[in-house]
Amino acid sequence: MTLEIEQFMCRSDNFGILARDSETGITALVDAPEEQAILEAIKRTGWTPSLLLITHHHADHVEANLALKERFGLTIIGPAKEASKIPGIDRQVNEGDVVRVGNQEARVIETPGHTAGHITFYFAKAGIAFTADTLFALGCGRLFECKPPVMYESLKKLVELPLETVIYCGHEYTESNARFALSVDPTNSALKERAKKIEALRREGRPTLPTTLGEEMATNPFLRCHDPVLRNNLGMKNAADVEVFAEIRKRKDVF
C-alpha cells in the first residue's frame, strides 16, 4: 500500500501533483495552479482525482479550483483560516485534522508564514509531506502575511518530522536558492556538492524535486540557523536562532 505521486510543471515554475492511493485508486490533486497542465497529467496517468487539497489561497495555487470541481466533482479541502479566499472550498481543516485519500491518511500541519493560514499535508505512513510554499528545496517562502518568527516556528514544526520524509514543494526555485545558499554558507561541502547536482539537473531540463528533510537540514540555510559556521558568516555569533533566520530571509529578499 503506497501513495503514488505524479509531479508535473504548471505555469512557469509551479509544480502540480497527483497523489494516488495504490490500493483503492483514489486520487487527490495537491493545489490547482493551471487547468490545462493538470488535465494533461490526468490523461497521461489515467488517475482521475476526487479530492483537491489546497495549501494556501494564492492565485497560482487555486486558479483552476472551480473549473476542475465542475469537471470532476472534486471535494475541495483547505485551510479554515483562509476559507473565504479559496474558491469552491467544501471542507475547512485546522491543525491536527486528518484527511483521507483512500487508505492513506494525511495530518494537517498549520505552517503559517508565507500566508497566515498556509498548511502542510503530511502522510506519515507514506513518509511524504506536501509543504507547498512554506519549505522549498534550499529555501522557504517569502513572508507576505507574517513576521519572521511565525515562519521560523512553522519550519521548527517541519524539522520534527523524520529525516527520511520526502518533501514536495510548490515551485521549482532550487537553482536560484542554491546560489543564495552558497552566498551565506560557502564552506558547506554538502551544499557545494548538491549545487553541482542541481545545476546538472536543470541543464537537462529535469526537476530538482522532491527532496528529503534530511537533505534540507544539511544544506538549507533557513533550517541551519543554529550552525556556528553559518552564524559566524553572518556576523551573528551570539544572536538568537530566530534573529539569524530573519537576517537570512532579509538577505534572500534582495538577493
From Swiss-Prot:
UniProtKB keywords: Hydrolase, Metal-binding, Zinc
Pathway assigned in UniProt: Secondary metabolite metabolism; methylglyoxal degradation; (R)-lactate from methylglyoxal: step 2/2
Binding site for Zn(2+) 1: H56, H58, H114, D133
Reactions catalysed, as given in the entry: an S-(2-hydroxyacyl)glutathione + H2O = a 2-hydroxy carboxylate + glutathione + H(+)
Example of a GO biological process term: methylglyoxal catabolic process to D-lactate via S-lactoyl-glutathione
GO MF terms held by the record: hydroxyacylglutathione hydrolase activity; metal ion binding
Statement: the UniProt record of this protein carries the keyword Zinc: yes
CDD domains (alphabetical): hydroxyacylglutathione_hydrolase_MBL-fold (cd07723)
Enzyme nomenclature, EC number: 3.1.2.6
SUPFAM superfamilies: Metallo-hydrolase/oxidoreductase
Residues annotated for Zn(2+) 2 binding in this entry: D60, H61, D133, H171
Subunit details: Monomer.
Stated role: Thiolesterase that catalyzes the hydrolysis of S-D-lactoyl-glutathione to form glutathione and D-lactic acid.
Family: Belongs to the metallo-beta-lactamase superfamily. Glyoxalase II family.
Record-given protein name: Hydroxyacylglutathione hydrolase
Organism: Chelativorans sp. (strain BNC1)
